[in-house]
Amino acid sequence: MSTVGFDAPARLGTVLTAMVTPFAADGSLDTAAAARLANHLVDSGCDGLVVSGTTGESPTTTDDEKRELLRVVLEAVGDRARVIAGAGTYDTAHSVRLAKACAAEGAHGLLVVTPYYSKPPQRGLIAHFTAVADATELPVLLYDIPGRSVVPIESSTIRALASHPNIVGVKDAKADLHAGGQIIAETGLAYYSGDDALNLPWLAMGATGFISVISHVAANQLRELLSAFTSGDIATARKINATVTPLCDAMARLGGVTMSKAGLRLQGIDVGDPRLPQVPATPEQIEALTADMRAASVLR
């Protein structure tokens, strides 16, 4: 495929949740809760879900669990939402195997994070992303998050990778709006905001949508924000963006996994606790999160 004529909203979605992975009390994968959560998120306004990403605690799940989770979510909502599978690790060969496994399960696309910890050079990033993109026919989103991976995907590297027929976009958590806007204009790559605090600015730069964490508890608000922006009602988009700001503050304090699982529980949706080394919210953190969610009008 090519970015020329690639319909990212239809093929990948516009308001996607980087979905948490539900675990049972014994720490095992809770597939029933995963199906319920997927349906809840789509019912709330998401047209796409990302499974086994950062917020999905992918470093703590086995390949078999990743496949099972993907299968369950596809069965639950795959006929009415795009399901994107996280397939990135710091091992290229492992990432290729994961990509092929996700394609075999029927994923609609792949999210491939920058190899973390090992700090490869840009030449290594090009080779890594190319190998994963070559492994299947699925559309691939690069995931640029130097706050976790240390190494950024430099603009020149993204431009080079944009020529690959399967690489169609970027999830940006680097916050370089200027560079991202230039790349969107030059390459036609679909950009997705990977930082909820910058959702509205990214739309202004030409982004397709969001791969969001706060959408676990505010999917409808983000859908309304996007709709307002695309219809030209910038004042309403700004108002909605300001309303959900307390959720971004909560995520910054607690981290995406802990905030999302605690927030869902406050809304009556139990997805279990995180796996170590992530930990559940403390009573004090839950009290503060409750106040933030009420301020954002997502909790009574």
Curated annotation (Swiss-Prot):
Part of a proton relay during catalysis (site feature) positions: 54, 117
Assembly, per entry: Homotetramer; dimer of dimers.
HAMAP family to which the protein is assigned, alphabetical: DapA
Protein name per Swiss-Prot or TrEMBL: 4-hydroxy-tetrahydrodipicolinate synthase
PANTHER family in UniProt: 4-HYDROXY-2-OXOGLUTARATE ALDOLASE, MITOCHONDRIAL, DIHYDRODIPICOLINATE SYNTHASE
Reactions the enzyme catalyzes: L-aspartate 4-semialdehyde + pyruvate = (2S,4S)-4-hydroxy-2,3,4,5-tetrahydrodipicolinate + H2O + H(+)
Catalytic residue list: 143, 171
Signal peptide extent: none
